Amino acid sequence: MPYIPHTPNDTKEMLTAVGAQDIQDLFDEIPASLQYAGFQSIPAGINEMEMLKEAQNQAQKNRNGICFIGAGCYEHHIPAAVWDIASRGEFLTAYTPYQAEASQGTLQLLYEYQTMICELTGMEVSNASMYDGATALAEAVLMAVRLNKHSKTNRVLITGTVHPFYRETIETIVRNQHIEVITLPFDEQQGITDFGSLNQYTGEDITALVIAQPNFFGCLEQVDKMTSWAHHNKTISVACVNPTSLALLKPPCSWGEHGVEIVCGEGQPLGSPMASGGPYFGFLSTRMAHVRQMPGRIIGRTVDKDGKTGFSLTLQAREQHIRRAKATSNICTNQGLLVTAATIYMSLLGPEGLSQVATQCHQNTHELITALTQIEGVELAFKAPFFHEALIKLNQPVQSVLQQLADAGIAGGYAPEQHYPQLANTLLVCATEVRSAEDIAKYAKTLKTIMSKRGA
């Protein structure tokens, strides 16, 4: 156990104090059969220069391809100022600012983040973030069950077009909560929820309805019809949305006749790098009437005894603070650092900048789909309108195509067949604002070459 502060004399003094001859004596009660012998083969440590060289050698093994993968994780341009500011010592922590008098800067930033999320979603109150989009949706389902006092069944309808990983997370979290999750089928021609399958539950006791917009396939759901159905059926409506899309699409507060009750989603597009899958953050917002059922924590603005504006942790009904059975959530912290980056990102871009990003994403994906569907053997899988990703169907094995694209330096998309067997040989592709016309042309040219080999 060599720690840098421990000099040989320090180690000898401590061993003498406990009556041991050497370090190994500290483990003499562990049978030799249980002790790992491989530690002896671990090489000696290296110096900083050698370590940097080794890191560079390992980094060179990475393949930096052109990315057309979406499926819940999106490559967006992040202004350099975002992480320059977020990495300042005053902000560089993911932990909770419990000591309000010493954390006004962090608390104000979190308060401003909540305000921005409310402006995006059109809701009245937001919490200070969740772990990621999947857990945010799972917590939204639990919140909906608590809110719906009319329901006695705890049955939750989830559209089959919700991200499959999100649905798996929901199943895991609610499994022991006496909640029944029912997955609605989707229209395999349109790529959106089959409204007829939802209509079959009219008049039945349904606790909550989960709607994704855009859905996993990038298609735009009939959110007005579905939200109005939920309202008339006394069902709590939960929207799972992409925050980038909210700069262009109708906000969830305006869906249907009365809007949704809860809005949540993945915040990664707002200034967080893809980073091999995380860390990310989730957002959740709702109406003020439901604030005491909201999970996580909420930052509020108040005044001190001198009348000066201040910020504090206003609500945090978590199992750390109250009886576990009465808590709204077991989430005990928040993704403060990622939220910091998101707040800076949204502040730098502003409403107009976010709208430009969303518009460019939409245009690039349409240009990509136009170019790809001109190739023989490639067609658009669904007819419904899409935002910034879409599903294409290939007449060749998708895994082989993906491998050949990868060999050409292109991350060609995500194959959903592992979650949807009926969608064999389809590919979910995405083109955000960072993809240039040259990138799209290269993808189309490479795919055309690959598809032409079939007849050779």
Curated annotation (Swiss-Prot):
<dbReference type="InterPro" id="IPR015421">
    <property type="entry name" value="PyrdxlP-dep_Trfase_major"/>
</dbReference>
<protein>
    <recommendedName>
        <fullName>Probable glycine dehydrogenase (decarboxylating) subunit 1</fullName>
        <ecNumber>1.4.4.2</ecNumber>
    </recommendedName>
</protein>
<dbReference type="InterPro" id="IPR049315">
    <property type="entry name" value="GDC-P_N"/>
</dbReference>
<comment type="subunit">
    <text>The glycine cleavage system is composed of four proteins: P, T, L and H. In this organism, the P 'protein' is a heterodimer of two subunits.</text>
</comment>
<dbReference type="GO" id="GO:0004375">
    <property type="term" value="F:glycine dehydrogenase (decarboxylating) activity"/>
</dbReference>
<dbReference type="InterPro" id="IPR015424">
    <property type="entry name" value="PyrdxlP-dep_Trfase"/>
</dbReference>
<dbReference type="InterPro" id="IPR015422">
    <property type="entry name" value="PyrdxlP-dep_Trfase_small"/>
</dbReference>
<comment type="similarity">
    <text>Belongs to the GcvP family. N-terminal subunit subfamily.</text>
</comment>
<keyword id="KW-0560">Oxidoreductase</keyword>
<dbReference type="InterPro" id="IPR023010">
    <property type="entry name" value="GcvPA"/>
</dbReference>
<dbReference type="GO" id="GO:0019464">
    <property type="term" value="P:glycine decarboxylation via glycine cleavage system"/>
</dbReference>
<dbReference type="Pfam" id="PF02347">
    <property type="entry name" value="GDC-P"/>
</dbReference>
<dbReference type="GO" id="GO:0009116">
    <property type="term" value="P:nucleoside metabolic process"/>
</dbReference>
<dbReference type="InterPro" id="IPR020581">
    <property type="entry name" value="GDC_P"/>
</dbReference>
<comment type="function">
    <text>The glycine cleavage system catalyzes the degradation of glycine. The P protein binds the alpha-amino group of glycine through its pyridoxal phosphate cofactor; CO(2) is released and the remaining methylamine moiety is then transferred to the lipoamide cofactor of the H protein.</text>
</comment>
